[in-house]
């Protein structure tokens, strides 16, 4: 800290001034953006019954439509990360938000399978930078000891968005049809993109950030001075990043967590209806419970992580331990194979999904270890590996269920993937510290 900043901060503290709370407003922007992100990608599930009937799309083709998003979403992670490092948080998120909202809106204009697939492909590409931007913004705006809680707050939008807005979305579809559903969500996203452009600033540019809050961020390891230089992309950078055990271990762990998440986003209602023989009304009621539990897991994981980091000063304990515990909890999904009570099954599923929610801390860990100037590329690599689960999990579970006629081995696969994540964090990841790359 230079002498001017030190004297300025000391004088402010002596006069009784308090740090501003501008970073909370920035976090609110991320939380709303993440909620819109997940609404845009999952609203197809609500529209599917009306949409398939009107467009004449059968179940097999609809499965391809559901998976189309994950293909381009994963493939666009690295290019999206490069773009983010080149153009920064504000421009990247504004363009991504605007484009994914327009592609969501265009779903409402689809006339057949081909146009619907084009919309899904476009949605996947345009949503790709969202979580790398989130991670990069948290790294800039929050000291290390607050990042897990901040990550948890925006991540909870993944689970609560659809649950909170489902009644409104069903009402829109029931009153105006499935096309109005996509148009409404898309229009809301475009409007929020304008809010983002108007409100977001980097810490060193934000006039609402006072000196005390600025020093709080900088002293805690936030990249808020504006002095960080963009690192030009080159293929050797990717090789160097992939060679780092921290990146490999964290990516495998996140892939494991996403395997559990994708099961709940895709096959879980079918599991309840066909394996547990629940009527659809009961499925609708019970399916909400694990998602509420997962939201609790996200918040609990963030709280525990920051508490551990503050109490011990160890990023290894503060970041790794909650994720390992969460993956172990997620692996208990296997035990549902031997339960006969529907309530017991839902409780086990909720416990497992609570644990999966804690794995969202992986983004906090990435913000801690990403090389300076390469937060976007690092986040893109990490998210690419994690979202391979979005491609593989629905296909593998579908093959298992088709071959065996039940979900017994499917649940073993999901639990086994969670245990693979535990092994990656214990034996591969190593120390949680910022990576230094050779020039």
Give the ranges of each region predicted by the language model.
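Extracytoplasmic
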Residues: 25-59, 264-269
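Extracytoplasmic gate region of multi-pass secondary transporters
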Residues: 44-45, 242-299, 359, 363, ...
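Helix-breaking motifs and short loop linkers at transmembrane-helix boundaries and internal kinks
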Residues: 56, 88, 109-115, 126, ...
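Conserved MFS/SLC helix-loop-helix module at the cytosolic interface between two early adjacent transmembrane helices
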Residues: 75-113
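Cytoplasmic helix-loop-helix junction between adjacent transmembrane helices
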Residues: 119-159
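Helix-loop-helix hairpin linking two adjacent transmembrane segments in secondary transporters
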Residues: 154-207
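C-terminal transmembrane helical hairpin of 12-TM major facilitator-type secondary transporters
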Residues: 316-362
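A late C-terminal transmembrane helix in Major Facilitator Superfamily
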Residues: 367-404
